[in-house]
């Protein structure tokens, strides 16, 4: 009936809001962390740099189900430790989903930004220093604008992956934290209404547009 359809629409809109919220928060944090790590691993000179750099490629090659289960076990151990130490009972929710999404998105941002850093001419920063700029000024006025297309490309890729993620979210979601992919899966288990086809098509189109924009930014940044 009309009431059932209205209720279903309400659940759908809530799932969309949840997906956008998780996507935006995890993308912002992952982009900041990924950029800083890319700079540290490219410019830094510290022991274990190569090993650390290789470790950040693991989320790209490890299957989603392995990551999802591993993170769920990790959160469960943390929750048990907190309950024993402080007597506070923690449960999975937006926090666990966002942390899980940050965990795999950092790697993608790092790879994209690091690729941009590799093509950057170091003499530009040296020229800025020769003109009297300190390291901070040289970074913000020279390095950051050059890195910006790479950072934006990494952010768009991270947001797309977060928006579409089902497996990792499935293992780390809590009550009332249904994202759009989880909502679609829940509806598919009951029946396949026409709305599912429309939502799925829209998700595919949004993903293609975001990935296309990310690739375009990467291509443009490679030329400059």
Where are these regions (language model features)?
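Interhelical loop and adjacent transmembrane-helix boundary motif
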Residues: 1, 163, 169-213, 217
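Membrane-interfacial helix termini and adjacent extracytoplasmic/periplasmic loops
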Residues: 4-5, 9-13, 43, 48-49, ...
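Transmembrane alpha-helix signature in integral membrane proteins
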Residues: 8-41
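Short hydrophobic faces within alpha-helices
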Residues: 16, 41, 58, 123-131, ...
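A structural signal for multi-pass alpha-helical bundles of membrane permease subunits
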Residues: 18, 67-86, 156-161, 173, ...
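Cytoplasmic-entry segments and transmembrane alpha-helices of multi-pass inner-membrane transporters
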Residues: 33-71, 125
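Transmembrane alpha-helices
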Residues: 58, 96, 102-103, 109-116, ...
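C-terminal transmembrane helix and the adjacent membrane-cytosol boundary/short C-terminal tail
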Residues: 114-129, 135-142, 197-224
């Amino acid at each position: 009936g009309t009431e059932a359809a209205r209720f279903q629409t309400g659940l759908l809109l809530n799932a969309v809001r949840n997906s956008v919220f998780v996507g935006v928060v995890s993308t912002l944090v992952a982009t900041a962390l990924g950029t800083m790590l890319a700079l540290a691993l490219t410019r830094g000179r510290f022991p274990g740099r190569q090993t650390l750099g290789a470790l950040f490629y693991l989320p790209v090659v490890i299957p989603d189900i392995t990551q999802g289960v591993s993170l769920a076990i990790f959160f469960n151990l943390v929750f048990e430790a907190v309950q024993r130490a402080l007597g506070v009972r923690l449960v999975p929710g937006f926090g666990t989903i966002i942390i899980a999404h940050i965990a795999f998105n950092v790697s993608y941002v790092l790879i994209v930004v690091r690729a941009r850093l590799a093509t950057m001419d170091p003499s530009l920063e040296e020229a800025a220093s020769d003109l009297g700029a300190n390291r901070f000024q040289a970074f913000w006025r020279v390095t950051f604008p050059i890195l910006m297309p790479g950072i934006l490309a990494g952010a768009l890729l991270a947001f797309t992956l977060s928006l579409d993620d089902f497996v990792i979210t499935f293992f780390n979601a809590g009550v009332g934290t249904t994202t759009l992919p989880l909502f679609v899966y829940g509806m598919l288990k009951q029946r396949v209404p026409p709305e599912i086809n429309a939502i799925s098509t829209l998700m595919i189109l949004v993903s293609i547009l975001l990935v296309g924009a990310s690739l375009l930014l990467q291509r443009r940044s490679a030329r400059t």
